[in-house]
Amino acid sequence: MINKTAAIIAGAGAGNRLGANLPKALVKLIDKTLVEHAVSSLAPVAQLLIVTAPAGFEEEFRKVLGDQVTVITGGILRSDSIRLALAQIPNNYEYVLVHDAARALATTTLAKSVVEQLVKGEQA
């Protein structure tokens, strides 16, 4: 895409309702973690990817995701995590997509469609 798009993936959820002993975003679905699925869907659309991780799990997220993303410590609430991630995005980005790692099966086609609508001036 020609425009500068950033994507925030909220992954700081604890996963308590899932009964997992690790953050929800690190739970595996088929062959990859939820956050890996989310990153792979958004990577073709966004030039900057920021993932929020629960405090104490940042290194595990970095090991799973590698250098293609920026991992930051999330906040107590989802809104805190998004605010912290927004503060990391340089001013020259035109669009910011906000996605939840737990919604890991959203497609690249959907993300491209959202950006295309934003470019046209639509709200998304």
Listing of model-derived features with the role each one plays in the protein:
Residues 1-3, 22, 30, 67, ...:
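Residue-level preference for short coil/turn positions at secondary-structure junctions
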Residues 26, 71, 123-124:
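Conserved beta-strand scaffold positions in the cores of enzyme catalytic domains, especially
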Residues 2-56:
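N-terminal glycine-rich phosphate-binding loop and ensuing alpha1 helix
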Residues 20-23, 40, 62-64, 109-111:
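Short amphipathic alpha-helical segments
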Residues 78-124:
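Conserved beta-loop-beta/alpha segment of the NTase-like Rossmann-fold superfamily
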Residues 17, 57-59, 103-105:
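Short, active-site-adjacent cap segments at secondary-structure transitions
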Residues 35-94:
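Conserved N-terminal catalytic core of the sugar/cofactor nucleotidyltransferase
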Residues 23, 73, 98-102:
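Conserved short-loop catalytic and cofactor-binding motifs
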